[in-house]
Amino acid sequence: MKIIFNADDFGISPGAVYGILESYRRGVVKSTTLLANSPAFDLAVEVAKENPGLDIGAHLTLTFGYPLLQGLETLTDDNGRFRKNYTALESGLANVDMEEVERELTAQIEKILGAGITISHFDTHHSIEPLIYPVQHKLAEKYGVSIRRHSDVSDFGAIKTPDLFDTSFYADGVSFETIKKIVQEHIGTNDVVEVMTHPAYIDETLREISSYVEPRIKEVSILTSRELQAYLGQQEVEIISFRDL
């Protein structure tokens, strides 16, 4: 089997940038996805350029912070911010203009590309793929990239995806045992499994803007542990990135 350990939220805070960098340099993370509207975007770009082996994707968002474009009336609240989570976006989905979605996501992609970063894949913040999949699919075809597989989507066409997407390494599931369980479920197969991760060093920026904080430092510890790397080697698990699909 093959595993892609993808680190979400690249750029959400300086601590997240450095936590992901540590998980790449000393650990099993080979892919990460960058938030174009994040506070530490410039730092993330700098780190990405200094570490060309780190595979970069776009962490497309309609539920974090402010959009890059103005005048997106169906996607924002009265203060011009995106709705805060999946549920809030879903509840107003009937009134969402998908042309606005496409324009904003295109702007996010182009900002990353314009910073000199090559993008290999797309995923989304708060896993909103089922709500915007036709737009995401269209953009993936346009830019020639892979995307994260989602259980609510059955037809990916010619777009490359991992075979499975596993979210169990999150919150109370952040443990070495969780990864062992994932491996045991797929060992001996040719499956490519993406494991979602959120490693970060905790800083004030992260505390202010994210509800998922404390487990992130534990993720760094596990993803960089010799124990995990030895186990994956013993099980002959190949660690790859989205570039390798």
UniProtKB/Swiss-Prot annotation:
Coiled-coil segments on the chain, per record: none
InterPro entries: COD_ChbG_bac, Glyco_hydro/deAcase_b/a-brl, YdjC-like
Keywords of this entry: Carbohydrate metabolism, Hydrolase, Magnesium, Metal-binding
Superkingdom of the source species: Bacteria
Functional description taken from the UniProt entry: Probably catalyzes the deacetylation of acetylated carbohydrates an important step in the degradation of oligosaccharides.
Oligomeric and partner information: Homodimer.
Protein name: Carbohydrate deacetylase 1
Organism: Listeria innocua serovar 6a (strain ATCC BAA-680 / CLIP 11262)
